[in-house]
């Protein structure tokens, strides 16, 4: 996902809706895929999201991502008023140590993690955003889904991947 992608913004929460009916047989693993044409803003948003997750766990990570999507003007333009809101968004997601958040967002290891997510996505057939990969962890079968598809289409791919 690219946090500056307007289509990803509309797609926020859809994969989670799709897995709900599978009761523990499917899960969502978020991977960053900031597109070059959304500039440094998309990368920086990914860094902050990752760092919020390190402080506030998965729930905080997804809360930050959803709030970023709600507030961003998208297409690399970022938040109204610039990055001044990031600390408040992070705190509302449960990451209260803003100083540690700032240090984390500048950590080369975080940038490498984002680059690794992009490389993994490309290897798996992702060429743009939004993009999903439905994988059966038992068999290793992976099925890429490109674009902001409806919940039912994701459910059908999950059913196919699970052998149902």
Name each model-derived stretch:
Residues 1, 13-17, 87-164:
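C-terminal cap of thioredoxin/glutaredoxin-like
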């Amino acid at each position: 996902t690219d946090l500056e992608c307007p289509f990803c913004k509309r797609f926020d929460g859809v994969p989670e809706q799709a897995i709900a009916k599978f009761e523990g047989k499917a899960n969502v693993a978020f991977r960053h895929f900031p597109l070059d044409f959304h500039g440094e803003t998309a990368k920086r948003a990914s860094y902050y999201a990752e760092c919020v997750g390190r402080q506030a766990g998965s729930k905080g990570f997804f809360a930050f991502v959803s709030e970023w999507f709600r507030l961003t003007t998208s297409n690399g333009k970022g938040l109204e008023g610039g990055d001044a809101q990031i600390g408040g968004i992070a705190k509302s997601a449960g990451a209260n140590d803003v100083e540690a958040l700032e240090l984390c967002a500048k950590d080369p290891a975080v940038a490498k993690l984002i680059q690794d997510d992009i490389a993994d996505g490309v290897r798996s057939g992702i060429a743009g955003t939004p993009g999903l990969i439905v994988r059966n962890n038992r068999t290793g079968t992976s099925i890429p889904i490109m674009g902001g598809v409806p919940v039912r289409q994701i459910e059908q791919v999950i059913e196919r991947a699970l052998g149902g």
